[in-house]
Regions:
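FAD-site-proximal beta/loop scaffold in flavoenzymes
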Residues: 250-281, 366-440
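Ferredoxin-type iron-sulfur electron-transfer modules in oxidoreductases and energy-metabolism complexes
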Residues: 20-38, 59-92, 109-136, 264-265
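Feature captures the FAD/FMN-dependent oxidoreductase FAD-binding
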Residues: 75, 138-139, 143-147, 195-246, ...
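Rossmann-like dinucleotide-binding cores of NAD(P)H-dependent redox enzymes
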Residues: 169, 173-203, 207-208, 297-344
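A conserved FAD-binding loop/helix module that cradles the flavin
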Residues: 436-463
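Local cysteine-cluster metal-coordination motifs and their immediate loop/turn environment
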Residues: 41-63, 85-108
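N-terminal Rossmann-like FAD-binding beta1-loop-alpha1 element of flavoenzymes
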Residues: 142-168, 293-301
Length: 464
C-alpha cells in the first residue's frame, strides 16, 4: 500500500459560517469514502503505536486506520468497537489534539493523522450501512446497577452487558445520555447519534430507568440491599454549576452555562412552542474559556443574539477549549475579550442585566495548574454593555449521593475518592468514575473510567 505523504490533513467539509451561525444543524459534515481512504493512507503504522497510548480507552488506532486505507470500513468499525462503546460520539467531541493525535508521529513535523475524523467516518458508515442486531450474551446470573447514563455510565453498562451481566441504568433526567444530551449542542453532536448509541445498548439487554434520582427516590444501600445488585457504579457526573461570587450574579438575565445549555439542548428552548424559552438578549457575555463556554456562546448566537462576547481572564493561547471549537467560534463571529475578568454585574430599573464591569488582567507566574496566574491591573476597569450573562466556570458533583451513602469517602470538592484507576470506592461493591470522581473533564476520560471500573466490578463479583 502506498502511503500518502501529504503534510496536511484532508480538510473537513463544514457548513459556511454565515449560514451555520443561524441554524442548529451539524457544523462538520464528515468525510466521504474517498477522503477517508486518502487520510488513512497518511498513517505510517509506527511499531510502538504512540497514538494508542494517547487514547484513554486504548483503541488499536493503526489497525482500524489500516482497514480504512484498504476500504474495509466494517472491519475498521469492529476494531474500534472492541474498545469503545461510543465511537460516533468520540469522533466528534474528543480532544484528539491532546490525546491520540497529540502522540502521532506524523504530527512532529507536519499535521497529525486525522484520527478523530476517521473514527467518526467509520462509526457513521457502520450506522448507515450495517443493520444487524448485536449479539446478546447469555445471562451470567449476576446483576449490577449503574447510576447515571452519561459517557462513564454508558461505557460501564456496555462492557458489563457484553460479559453477560443484567445491567440497569438509573438516570435522573427524563432521557438517557447525560452531558451528551444536555450539555453538547446539536450543531456539534446531533442527539439522534447519541440516541442510536443508547438504542444499541438496549438491544444488548441494558435496562434504562429514567426520572430516577438516586439519593432521593432510592439510595445505594437500597439498591444493594432489597434490590439485590451485587455491585454499583456511580457515574452521576458533575452538574452543579460554579459562580464567581461577584455582585449582581442573582440578577435576571444571568444563567449558568449548565442551565442555558440544558434548556436549549434538551428542552429545545429555541423552538417557538417551547415550554422553557430562554430570554437571550441582543448582547451576551459568556464568562469562561472552555468547550462549554464555546458551546454556550455559539448557541446564544443561534438563538438570536446580535453580539456575543467570550470574557476570559487569560489570553487566547491559554484557552482550554479545543482549537477547533475556538476556530469555529471565531469564524461565526464570536468576539473574544481576553485578559479581562468581570467584577460586577449591573441591573436596569426592572432588575435585568444591563452591563458588566470588567477589569483588565496580566499574566504572572505559573499557578498550581502550571498555567500563568492572571493578576488584576489596578485602575483598568471598563464597562461592557450586555443584557445576558452566562457563567461557564466549571461544575461540581451533586451532593445527593454522598449525603445519602454512609461511608462513601469524598474530597473537599465533593468528588468521590477512588483507589487507583479501577474506580473502587471506600464502600465495598461500590465503584465510581467520570466527572463524579474527577470533576468536569472530557467525554473520553469518563469513558476510560467507566471501562476500567467495569473490569474491576467483574473481577470483584467473580471472586465473591
Amino acid at each position: 500500500m502506498a502511503f500518502n505523504m501529504d503534510p496536511k490533513k484532508c480538510p473537513m467539509p463544514t457548513q459556511d459560517p454565515n449560514v451555520r451561525n443561524k441554524n442548529f444543524e451539524e457544523v462538520a459534515q464528515g468525510y466521504t469514502e474517498e477522503m477517508a481512504v486518502n487520510e488513512a493512507k497518511r498513517c505510517i503504522h509506527c511499531k510502538n503505536k504512540p497514538c494508542q497510548t494517547g487514547c484513554p480507552v486504548g483503541i488499536d488506532i493503526p489497525e482500524f486506520i489500516g482497514h480504512v486505507a484498504e476500504g474495509d470500513f466494517e472491519a475498521a468499525y469492529q476494531v474500534i468497537a472492541r474498545s469503545s462503546s461510543l465511537p460516533a460520539v468520540c469522533g466528534r467531541v474528543c480532544p484528539q489534539e491532546s490525546q491520540c493525535e497529540g502522540k502521532c508521529t506524523r504530527g512532529i513535523k507536519n499535521e497529525p493523522v486525522g484520527i478523530g475524523r476517521l473514527e467518526r467516518f467509520v462509526a457513521d458508515w457502520h450506522r448507515e450501512n450495517v443493520h444487524t442486531a448485536p449479539i446478546v450474551p447469555a445471562w451470567n446470573g449476576h446483576k449490577v446497577a449503574i447510576i447515571g447514563a452519561g459517557p462513564a455510565g454508558l461505557t460501564a453498562a456496555g462492557d458489563l452487558a457484553k460479559l453477560g451481566y443484567k445491567v440497569t441504568v438509573y438516570e435522573a433526567l427524563h432521557v438517557a445520555g447525560g452531558v451528551l444530551m444536555y450539555g453538547i449542542p446539536e450543531f456539534r453532536l446531533p442527539k439522534a447519534i447519541v440516541q442510536q448509541e443508547i438504542d444499541g445498548l438496549k438491544k444488548m439487554g441494558v435496562d434504562f430507568e429514567c426520572n430516577m434520582v438516586i439519593g432521593k427516590v432510592l439510595t445505594i444501600d437500597e439498591l444493594m440491599g432489597e434490590y439485590g445488585y451485587e455491585a454499583v457504579f456511580v457515574g452521576s457526573g458533575a452538574g452543579l454549576p460554579r459562580f464567581m461570587g461577584i455582585p449582581g450574579e442573582s440578577l435576571k438575565g444571568v444563567y449558568s452555562a449548565n442551565e442555558f445549555l440544558t434548556r436549549s439542548n434538551l428542552m429545545k428552548a429555541y423552538l417557538p412552542t417551547s415550554k422553557t424559552p430562554i430570554r437571550t438578549g441582543k448582547k451576551v457575555a459568556v464568562v469562561g474559556g472552555g468547550n462549554v463556554a464555546m458551546d454556550a456562546a455559539r448557541s446564544a448566537l443561534r438563538l438570536g443574539a446580535e453580539t456575543v462576547y467570550i470574557v476570559y481572564r487569560r489570553g487566547m493561547a491559554e484557552l482550554p477549549a479545543r482549537k477547533e471549537e475556538v476556530e469555529h467560534a471565531e469564524e461565526e463571529g464570536i468576539i473574544f475579550k481576553t485578559l479581562c475578568n468581570p467584577v460586577e454585574i449591573h441591573a436596569n430599573d426592572e432588575g435585568f442585566v444591563k452591563s458588566i464591569t470588567c477589569i483588565e488582567m496580566e499574566l504572572g507566574e505559573p499557578d498550581a495548574s502550571g498555567r500563568r496566574r492572571p493578576i488584576e491591573k489596578t485602575g483598568s476597569e471598563f464597562e461592557l454593555d450586555v443584557d445576558t450573562v452566562i457563567m461557564s466556570l466549571g461544575t461540581s458533583p451533586n451532593p445527593l449521593i454522598r449525603s445519602t451513602t454512609p461511608g462513601l469517602e469524598t474530597n473537599k470538592h465533593g468528588c468521590i475518592v477512588t483507589e487507583g484507576d479501577e474506580g473502587k470506592t471506600s464502600r465495598e461493591g461500590v465503584y465510581a468514575g467520570g466527572d463524579a470522581v474527577t470533576g468536569a473533564a472530557t467525554v473520553i476520560k469518563a469513558m476510560g473510567a467507566g471501562k476500567a471500573a467495569a473490569k474491576a466490578m467483574d473481577e470483584y463479583i467473580q471472586n465473591q
